[in-house]
Amino acid sequence: MAKNLILWLVIAVVLMSVFQSFGPSESNGRKVDYSTFLQEVNNDQVREARINGREINVTKKDSNRYTTYIPVQDPKLLDNLLTKNVKVVGEPPEEPSLLASIFISWFPMLLLIGVWIFFMRQMQGGGGKGAMSFGKSKARMLTEDQIKTTFADVAGCDEAKEEVAELVEYLREPSRFQKLGGKIPKGVLMVGPPGTGKTLLAKAIAGEAKVPFFTISGSDFVEMFVGVGASRVRDMFEQAKKAAPCIIFIDEIDAVGRQRGAGLGGGHDEREQTLNQMLVEMDGFEGNEGIIVIAATNRPDVLDPALLRPGRFDRQVVVGLPDVRGREQILKVHMRRVPLAPDIDAAIIARGTPGFSGADLANLVNEAALFAARGNKRVVSMVEFEKAKDKIMMGAERRSMVMTEAQKESTAYHEAGHAIIGRLVPEHDPVHKVTIIPRGRALGVTFFLPEGDAISASRQKLESQISTLYGGRLAEEIIYGPEHVSTGASNDIKVATNLARNMVTQWGFSEKLGPLLYAEEEGEVFLGRSVAKAKHMSDETARIIDQEVKALIERNYNRARQLLTDNMDILHAMKDALMKYETIDAPQIDDLMARRDVRPPAGWEEPGASNNSGDNGSPKAPRPVDEPRTPNPGNTMSEQLGDK
């Protein structure tokens, strides 16, 4: 930044000097008005007058000098001067030099060209590559000294590591494979959800292989100029040929490798040209021996089939979400840099985090360390890991949000309805935690934690989920009446409706329609796929689908209503527990469902005489209630956005 400022200052000084030297020179001496000059001529005080256009340099008889200017053409001036014996000297007008004329005429164009070059250099990354380097590859070559990641830093994806380990062995000992006639795959495509470690695995390959490693993003190819993408692909492979054997890693390849065909607008032509060049370079007329292309994407469905065929990306490595054993290994890798308390058990944390990716687990360990740092602790304990898990799963607490007692009570009934139905219906995930503390965008959260990694779901389990989703709305309706039901169940209704529609149209859970696929692909339109969609069902079939979805919803809605009506004592008791403790866990829910006195949550400190429930002791055991409580008109708009 300082160098650029100095450069511009030097340029400004030079330009000012040039204009100063090429500009008209100012006359030395004082200036006198023309009338005074004429008066002195008439008084015979002037000895010499040098006339240069309208400027007159005057020398008086007493040797004083001054300059005056003729305001208008005066035809009598010359006669008057000669009459008074004034020496008249004529001087030619001052003309600029040829160099100055050329410079002044070309300066605006040169300035525009200079500004254009400056901005082009800035767009090329700071001006270090030259103004015409658009077609040069942006791939960065990393040497073995720059990459410290190894397979020891990658955990939770043993099968994927075994697949890519062959690449490393080939690069180290190619003769071992060649003598048996084997050929190493030219390309490996790593596929998996976001955060599962695809890029980390590529770094580990580079660290283990000890060969040059070129890395580039799929979005670095296509830019504002036509032909830049294809040129960069050619240049990248030219560089790789010079450094072979080597590895090229293309992250997020779906940015440039999407399926060719009709798309939106005409901008896809440049991307297709780039893709065509990549197809030729990977397996075209000229071979690229010793170059292995590794790519990563989380959208393999949009890639062009020609890119996925053998000879280009021969092997697809699925890097999926880790299972419980993989999560434990990942946690141990990230825990190596954190001082841990003796009570830390990675296996317990792994069992409580189903569905977490490697990035989620890394974030979990980091959040736990931050919680410990806020508490001025020297080690990280299980308490911090529980707080971190709740924050990631349910959102950050918003204790500063002001809620009235009526809103808290409505939220407590809503969340209690979810929890009770979740405990009473079959095959439902266990209730892990219920809270009325606002978290994220929700005023309250009921969190269900699966006991293991979910692979598939039965029809009974899905219907239980629908019943549980409507438990919150039904609790409000039963307690306060239909006219006081809030909008807090909007997200629950959306999720339940989508679940029921999928059961009918995709999973064959309708006796009337049978095991047929009725759902149309509803993915977003993207470049490389046709915009037009064909209709695959008649209007009558669509009407039957709507009827089946509605019947499925109503059946589970009525089941949830009956369960809540039969357990009103538990509903009121759970509301009281939530109003007092704000957050209850599985042990408190077990006490409530067993109609026992509720034990305080772990770490609970009695606040004294003041508490939300108006009772200093623990909430009492549920007791049968014959009539619903009086509706509270102050909670008609309690919004639990995304409360489940």
Swiss-Prot record:
Q: List locations, semicolon-separated.
A: Cell inner membrane
Query: What protein family is recorded?
Result: In the central section; belongs to the AAA ATPase family. In the C-terminal section; belongs to the peptidase M41 family.
Q: What happens when the gene is disrupted?
A: Lethality, due to increased levels of LpxC, which increases the level of LPS in the cell and results in formation of abnormal membrane structures in the periplasm. Lethality is suppressed under conditions in which LPS synthesis is reduced. Disruption confers resistance to cellular contact-dependent growth inhibition (CDI) CdiA of E.coli strain 536, E.cloacae strain ATCC 13047 and of Y.pestis strain A, but not to CdiA from E.coli strain 93 toxin.
State its role. Answer: Acts as a processive, ATP-dependent zinc metallopeptidase for both cytoplasmic and membrane proteins. Plays a role in the quality control of integral membrane proteins. Degrades a few membrane proteins that have not been assembled into complexes such as SecY, F(0) ATPase subunit a and YccA, and also cytoplasmic proteins sigma-32, LpxC, KdtA and phage lambda cII protein among others. Degrades membrane proteins in a processive manner starting at either the N- or C-terminus; recognition requires a cytoplasmic tail of about 20 residues with no apparent sequence requirements.
Q: Where is this site: Substrate binding?
A: F225
Q: What result follows from mutating L307A?
A: Low protease activity in vivo
Please indicate the ranges of residues that lie on the Cytoplasmic side. Answer: 1-4, 120-644
Main subcellular location of this protein, as a coarse class: membrane
Listed transmembrane segments: 5-25, 99-119
The record gives the effect of mutating H418Y as: In tolZ21; loss of protease function in vivo, retains about 25% ATPase activity, temperature sensitive
Q: Catalytic center at which residues?
A: E415
The annotated subunit structure for this chain is: The E.coli AAA domain has been modeled as a homohexamer, in Thermus thermophilus the same domain crystallizes as a homohexamer. Forms a complex with HflKC (formerly called HflA); complex formation is stimulated by ATP. Interacts with YccA, and probably weakly with QmcA. Can be cross-linked to YidC (OxaA) and to a nascent polypeptide chain for an integral membrane protein.
Is rRNA-binding a UniProt keyword of this protein? no
* Chain residues that bind Zn(2+): H414, H418, D492
Documented EC number(s): 3.4.24.-
Against HAMAP family, the record matches this protein to: FtsH (MF_01458)
UniProt-listed NCBIfam families: FtsH_fam (TIGR01241), PRK10733.1 (NF008004)
* Periplasmic-side positions: 26-98
Q: Which organism is it from?
A: Escherichia coli (strain K12)
Q: Identify this protein by name.
A: ATP-dependent zinc metalloprotease FtsH
**Per its record, what are the GO molecular function terms?**
ATP binding; ATP hydrolysis activity; ATP-dependent peptidase activity; metalloendopeptidase activity; zinc ion binding
| Topological relation to the membrane, as annotated | Multi-pass membrane protein
Which parts of this chain are annotated as the region Disordered? 598-644
- Where on this chain does ATP bind? G192, P193, P194, G195, T196, G197, K198, T199
Query: Tell me, what controls this protein's activity?
Result: (Microbial infection) Activity against phage lambda cII protein is inhibited by EDTA but not by PMSF. In vitro pre-incubation of FtsH with HflKC abolishes its activity against phage lambda cII protein at the cytoplasmic side of the membrane.
Cofactor descriptive note: Binds 1 zinc ion per subunit.
